């Protein structure tokens, strides 16, 4: 927000430089990003002087150019070639001399000596738009005859200089969205730093109703959305250009003057943070303003000429027949003041922040008014600002105040009562601040001390401080005015945090696994926990009924919390694939959120909600790219399986103690589940369905693994990693070719083998699968290798044969396996 240095001084007296003001505001929480010297006219008209055209003749080589000589007050006529149709001898004009910078928006160009059609030109005679004092380009500026050649243009036009402070207002500081609001905080800073200061604002004691010739009734039908609405009429106004002082104020902060009536409303909102609206009183049909909602789907044309369909919860300002304005957001096309307006109705209201915010979001509108209303303005300043605006309209546009102020207020805004203890102040700030200093700070921030004891204060916080409703909020205010830099950093820190425990172990293991995956060529991704509810439509794996929905989403693309990491990863894959990067390996750690309506409990609001920490892996594209050593090789689900198994091994899990099952659902076309013997799901991995990939415009196969990190951490609690020396005795390998039913999986063979020989069997591996000729229908052949080793002796043939015979028998009994 742009704050004028000179405007600020109208409300609080100080002797600080602009840079010192910026530093002071930053130190008390109103971060000021920069200070810029500005003029009421961009560039300050530097280098421009008043000149008199002495001679004007036609250019010999042009049918529209003129050669002039101009007296610039320095004794020597200056030759300038001019193309304006209205240039003539004897005129007083504005001349840009050599080196002058003229601005066109954000760009500028420098006046240089030049030759135009063979004739030397030393300067430029200017039009309004070329020097920033108007928009006309029909011809050069012709000044009154009393203008004196040689006078600097900045003096002739009374250009004022000022400094603009770029103050970054955080969303909670609605009270600081104005010059007066910033002045309040600066006043508190000055008082705390021992400087004499006073906070003032213009008096409205002179406000008086002169007649009742234009009485307009006000009715509020929805007091929830509009707790306060006030209005007054001014009759017989003349809409015209604003006086120079008002135009300059607005230009300094980056606003374009419109006319006196509109400029007054803009002045008020930037001075005191109260948005106003000015209606043409003669367009208020039926002589009544009604604040209400309209039926769903009602059409309304706003000031920008756009026809909008209203929601049933869009609050509208209406007359007896039509809607005139979207309350607190945007005016209507046909109800505002124009140059033909003679009577006005001024509106000053307090609209509920939630109503304004939702309406503004629905219609994609962001105005100065909605910016302030949706954060919460001061409900008690509405009448003051209305009186001030009416007095200014009377002064600058003429007319008479022709009605009483109609103030419809559901209930007066009450102060927030806060109990503050000195002990908590000292505890949260980390320093003992003198009681008198605390009292001085809170009173300088316009908080009233209602009661005082040895232990603390009872404070009444004004309603405009919507961010201060608890004792910790008051303490934050005390700290920022006292000064963050005045709180010494202690030599020791008292902390309840511990460097030990499950949380720390989980973080270490997460980093361990992340490094392992990075070493395997994975890239970590971080996706938003907010996602699109439409992704879950029709899914049985992740039903829509289990979504944690947002009450006030920013958009339909971010309207719920994710149930799975999958969709964020598919978005990342699609994004990369669209940029010709299709060979991808991603991993992500993140929370997934669930809602279970059956767990609703009035006494435990959060009971239906849960979150689990997960690890997601995505593999797609080529595993090996074409080279002199290898041909292209696409990745597969077996590669993903290896990554999952390696993670389990790295965490110390015994793979043989896990239960593997098959899965096929609306996420996976084929997949495996990995559970503990107690039935807890540790992981699911497999091939993502074509339908799911199509929804994300992904062409390649995608293999996805979902690991429940929370359950993994529970599963490894009892795992103890022990070290032992490498066996001195050789290992022995035996191979079996087994004929089995097609439905038998290798995991079943592996499980039976380890159950058969728990001590000497070290490894079971599959090195060949055959299906086809010379095999019975419904059969397949597995070539399986078994690695045996004894830690204490060398195995002999008798021992090996005994083990292998037992293995063959168990495989035959349990799986129907036959040796080939």
Curated annotation (Swiss-Prot):
Q: Which GO MF terms are attached to this record?
A: ATP binding; magnesium ion binding; phenylalanine-tRNA ligase activity; tRNA binding
- What is the superkingdom listed in this entry's lineage? Bacteria
Residues annotated as domain FDX-ACB? 727-820
**Residues covered by the tRNA-binding domain:** 42-154
Q: Which UniProt keywords apply?
A: Aminoacyl-tRNA synthetase, ATP-binding, Cytoplasm, Ligase, Magnesium, Metal-binding, Nucleotide-binding, Protein biosynthesis, RNA-binding, tRNA-binding
Could you tell me what the cofactor note in this record states? Binds 2 magnesium ions per tetramer.
Query: Which positions bind Mg(2+)?
Result: 467, 473, 476-477
**Location relative to the cell:** Cytoplasm
Cofactor(s) the protein needs: Mg(2+)
Tell me the CDD domains matching this sequence. PheRS_beta_core, tRNA_bind_bactPheRS
The cross-references to PROSITE patterns, in alphabetical order and at most eight, read:
B5 (PS51483), FDX_ACB (PS51447), TRBD (PS50886)
What's the Enzyme Commission number for this chain? 6.1.1.20
Top-level EC class as recorded in UniProt: ligase
Give Gene Ontology CC terms. Answer: phenylalanine-tRNA ligase complex
BP term (GO), one: phenylalanyl-tRNA aminoacylation
Q: Which reaction does it catalyse?
A: tRNA(Phe) + L-phenylalanine + ATP = L-phenylalanyl-tRNA(Phe) + AMP + diphosphate + H(+)
InterPro entries to which the protein is assigned, alphabetical = aa-tRNA-synth_II/BPL/LPL, B3/B4_tRNA-bd, DNA-bd_dom_put_sf, Fdx_antiC-bd, Fdx_antiC-bd_sf, NA-bd_OB-fold, Phe-tRNA-ligase_IIc_bsu, Phe-tRNA-ligase_IIc_bsu_bact
Residues of the B5 domain: 413-489
Family in the record: Belongs to the phenylalanyl-tRNA synthetase beta subunit family. Type 1 subfamily.
The entry describes its oligomerization and partners as: Tetramer of two alpha and two beta subunits.
Q: Please report the name of this protein according to its UniProt entry.
A: Phenylalanine--tRNA ligase beta subunit
The organism named in the record is Bacteroides fragilis (strain ATCC 25285 / DSM 2151 / CCUG 4856 / JCM 11019 / LMG 10263 / NCTC 9343 / Onslow / VPI 2553 / EN-2)
Gene from which this protein is expressed: pheT
